Amino acid sequence: MYRLKCDVKSYGWGKVGHESLAAKLAEAGYGFEVDPNTPYAELWMGSHPSGPSFVMQTGKPLSELLTPETVGEKVYKKYGKQLPFLFKVLSINKVLSIQAHPDKPLGKQLHKTNPKEYKDDNHKPEMAVALTEFDALCGFRPVKQIEQFLDSIAPLREFVGEEAVRQFKGTVKQDERKALETLFNELMHKDEKRIQEFTPQLVQLAKSDANNFGGTEYGGKAFSDLIIHLNSQFPDDIGLFVTPFLNYVRLHPGEAVFLRALDPHAYVSGNIIECMAASDNVIRLGFTPKFKDIETLVNNLTYQTADAKSQLTQPVPFAKACGSGKTLLYDPPIEEFSILQTKVSPGQKQCIRGINGPSILLVTEGSGILNGDKGDVASISPGFVYFISANFPLTISATSEPVVVYQAFCEI
């Protein structure tokens, strides 16, 4: 096991100074200097070239440590000297862009044609685990809910266009995906003048009829508050009219959501653990001052609809864990990564039998000891990050207070 110094990203949507959990963990873990006036958004843990981690004992990049022995023969054969995943902590003060991430064919195409904006050729499915209450928009709502919003929110219906809405309703039963794609394409090509014309109407309705905004079944006060909040951060933005098309979820600590490639989403607020395939590719369409690639996104989204609950990832007990603590497995339907959450109370021990691949372990709460099977001993406290070699059994012990650790890993 090797202790790491990791990379902190400062983006405008991050929490400021010591309000940022990402910054506080980096400060506690390796002495990162926190500026009280700077927004700190992400803590990156991995070997991605846009924000690599370094081994504290040697000062060398983590990638130089990756060999068939440390990551396992199968993982090394497929991924070489780069980890297949990127592990993060996000501290969200302001809504992130409405975005999607490419699948593998699109990732290769975008990197080839526009390497300035798309810096690698990989896909980027990702999973978020809430550390605090976490609000997000994720995936297209069921068509029934979209229809209700179009019926009950006049400024939304009029913004998209009455004729476009009629065509949507007339074709949705024959081909739901195509009907949604056509309607969404119409919405995304409205000009700035129209956005500025209808935004005040949408926000005013959210304020004046808060409890009934969008209908009580799927809308109501929480949804009207969301519209008002988003407009305060990004006034007159196309994202405001996209929001009713997407599921709005509030996750509690320990709950998780998996986001497939080419599914639209936006993180609204909170602190999360995030893991993804090792990519930094983002296709944006709203709530951002950065480059928007609307044509690419509109032409490549899945347009699959589902309710919010179907996108949640339910953790299960981890079969390779034993002891008096508790270890849960978050296992998305891809090979690049899974996440473990381990909780150990004072006086308890929890063993994680050797994982057949590389892992990165982050301590978020408490203090204790890590023990390897060959006499390796290391202390743990919040912000400590360790790279764990393949097939390396671990025992996690808590000393004076409960310990919580998250561990991203890849097994093939």
UniProtKB/Swiss-Prot annotation:
The keyword Repeat does not apply. It is an enzyme of class 5 (isomerase). Keywords: Cytoplasm, Isomerase, Metal-binding, Nucleus, Zinc. It is found in: Cytoplasm; Nucleus. GO terms for biological process: carbohydrate metabolic process; GDP-mannose biosynthetic process; protein glycosylation. Involved in the synthesis of the GDP-mannose and dolichol-phosphate-mannose required for a number of critical mannosyl transfer reactions. Its main location: cytoplasm. Binds 1 zinc ion per subunit. Belongs to the mannose-6-phosphate isomerase type 1 family. The active site is at residue 284. Pathway: Nucleotide-sugar biosynthesis; GDP-alpha-D-mannose biosynthesis; alpha-D-mannose 1-phosphate from D-fructose 6-phosphate: step 1/2. It comes from the Eukaryota. The keyword NAD does not apply. This is Mannose-6-phosphate isomerase. SUPFAM superfamilies: RmlC-like cupins.
